[in-house]
A protein has these predicted regions:
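Bacterial Sec-dependent N-terminal signal peptides
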Residues: 1-20
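Secretory-pathway ectodomains
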Residues: 20-155
Length: 155
């Protein structure tokens, strides 16, 4: 049985009620991204992942769009499931982490040889790239989550 990795994001914007009453959930092995009512556990919205889209990170943008990473890329989608942008990674890489930046952009953590941290603008276009030699040959073993600190360093 697959272990589900649940990523909880307390929504910064309301969706049919106060943000603290909702939970945006995704996980490795779960075929959907879900918006749950915390009180009732009722699914209020769901986005079906495409075959092979193992979601390990999900977030709600300031505009109210849903950002998520999948094994071979990251997507930004609307509540009506329209794809705003889809960033695909090269062969022999994995994308485990997609996090929001303070400027409204996105930070991607791409596992591969070499590994890369890539910053995208709000439209999904590359604006910065950092290449890393982690001395770990298997991309799947490199890292899971990447964040940018207020001083612009990466964690």
């Amino acid at each position: 049985m697959r272990v589900y990795i649940i990523i909880w994001i307390i929504l910064s914007m309301g969706f049919r009620a106060a943000a603290q009453d909702k939970l945006l959930v995704a996980g490795s092995g779960n075929p959907n991204i879900l918006l749950l009512d915390k009180q009732t556990g009722k699914v209020e919205w769901q986005h079906a992942l495409e075959k092979g889209e193992e979601c390990n990170a999900v977030a709600l943008t300031q505009k109210g769009e849903i950002l998520y990473s999948y094994k071979r890329g990251a997507k930004l989608v609307t509540w009506d499931h329209q794809v705003v942008w889809d960033y695909k990674t090269p062969d022999k890489t994995e994308l485990q982490s997609a996090t929001l930046l303070q400027n409204g952009g996105v930070l991607l953590g791409i596992c591969g040889v070499p590994a890369q941290f890539i910053e995208l603008d709000k439209k999904g276009k590359e604006v910065n790239k950092v290449t890393l030699n982690l001395e770990v040959e298997r991309p799947h073993s490199q890292f899971r989550q990447v964040f940018q600190l207020r001083n612009s360093n990466y964690l």
